[in-house]
């Protein structure tokens, strides 16, 4: 059986943690930031965890993680 390929888009966006969780960045923080409030931009800093319902699809995209 051939090797499975990792989705390049997923390996750039997700980081698998030791406890089995997956870390991701927040959306809505790339451009058109002038109309967003300072509070909103501050809350979008840092990282978040992928929801439990989405873990299966992320795991399919990252077969060796």
UniProtKB/Swiss-Prot annotation:
GO terms for molecular function: structural constituent of ribosome. InterPro entries: Ribosomal_bL35 (IPR001706), Ribosomal_bL35-like (IPR021137), Ribosomal_bL35_CS (IPR018265), Ribosomal_bL35_sf (IPR037229). Keywords: Ribonucleoprotein, Ribosomal protein. One of its GO terms (biological process) is translation. Gene3D superfamilies: 4.10.410.60. Belongs to the bacterial ribosomal protein bL35 family. This is Large ribosomal subunit protein bL35. It comes from Neisseria meningitidis serogroup B (strain ATCC BAA-335 / MC58).
